[in-house]
Regions:
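Flexible "cap/lid" loop of the alpha/beta hydrolase fold
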Residues: 116-146
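Active-site loop/oxyanion-hole signature of alpha/beta-hydrolase fold enzymes
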Residues: 54-96
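Alpha/beta-hydrolase fold catalytic core
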Residues: 1-29, 49-50, 89-90, 263-270
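Catalytic histidine-centered segment of alpha/beta-hydrolase-like enzymes
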Residues: 250-259
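Acidic catalytic loop of the alpha/beta-hydrolase fold
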Residues: 223-227
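Conserved HGGG/HGGXW glycine-rich cap/lid loop of the alpha/beta-hydrolase fold
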Residues: 21-62
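Conserved alpha/beta-hydrolase catalytic His-Asp/Glu region
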Residues: 128, 149-210
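Short beta-strand/loop motif that positions the catalytic acidic residue
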Residues: 212, 218-220
């Protein structure tokens, strides 16, 4: 039987925020999701015990989707920190995936608050990245709106095949987890975030990664269709105390292609 996962809500800056929490003793692990997923993405980790926390960021999952909200990189990063403060989280272990990398913006400013760090196939806050083709469409005004308006569950499932290491279909519950929350508000938030994220802004956001001196683990699938493995190496080079593991035949969500990744991450976190 898995750990008891508590569900809760809080209001931060007038925005309704949903979160999942697993109680326990010690430093909590904060799991930071990417796009187009949300906190449910982390259930395989949360079910193994706590203390742990996974927040649905505004615009995604079961949190609100306010029209007047700062969905920029720095806006979302700052909002996450306000959520953590509201929940009484200061020192933390940090696990980031995809756009969860935005948590590293605050970690560079307050590295003493991060006890351990795991970076999994994350958006590169590093020089030299160029967006994958879907993101390039999202970043084009009019084109991104058209793509989102014409997306169906079937086309989403087809697109997600490229996220698998062997390009096989994603498990239907995973597709449902995304599709059930892929509404107009999430689509709007997605476009706002990607359009804020010019490559030079990504690089500038990670200029002080070398300040994060805690033990770190970088895990990356060598078949990630969105984020080439050279950025795994670049993250490992930028973080002073990082280990690097590149997983053969694994895609963008390593714990789906290789469930043993959950054990590896939890073992590293201690």
């Amino acid at each position: 039987m898995g750990a008891a996962i508590e569900e809760g809500r809080l209001r931060v800056d007038g925005v309704d925020v949903f979160y999942r929490r697993v109680p326990g003793e010690g430093t909590p692990t904060v799991y930071c999701h990417g796009n187009p997923t949300h906190g449910e993405d982390w259930l395989p980790f949360l079910e193994r015990g706590g203390p742990a926390l996974a927040i649905d960021m505004p615009g995604w999952g079961r949190s609100a989707r306010p029209e007047r909200f700062d969905y920029s990189m720095y806006g979302l990063s700052a909002f996450l920190e306000r959520c953590l403060a509201e929940l009484g989280v200061e020192r933390r272990k940090l696990v980031v995936h995809d756009w969860g990398a935005l948590a590293l913006i605050a970690a560079q400013r307050r590295p003493e608050l991060v006890e351990r760090l795991v970076v999994i196939d994350s958006v590169p806050l590093l020089p030299g990245y160029r967006w994958h083709w879907v993101a390039q469409l999202w970043r084009r005004r009019g084109v991104g709106e058209l793509l989102n308006a014409t997306t169906t569950r079937s086309s989403l499932a087809l697109l997600l095949r490229q996220a698998r290491g062997d390009r096989s279909p994603m498990p239907p519950p995973f597709v449902d987890m995304i599709w059930d929350h892929w509404d107009a508000g999430t689509r709007r938030a997605t476009l706002a975030l990607y359009r804020d994220a010019d490559p030079d802004r990504l690089a500038a956001a990670g200029l002080d990664l070398d300040r994060i001196g805690c033990p770190a683990l970088v895990i990356w699938g060598d078949r990630d269709a969105y984020l080439p493995t050279r950025f795994a190496r670049a993250y490992a080079d930028a973080l002073p105390a990082a280990e690097l593991e590149i997983l053969a035949g694994v895609g963008h969500w390593p714990w789906i292609d290789q469930p043993g990744v959950v054990d590896r991450v939890l073992g590293f976190l201690g």
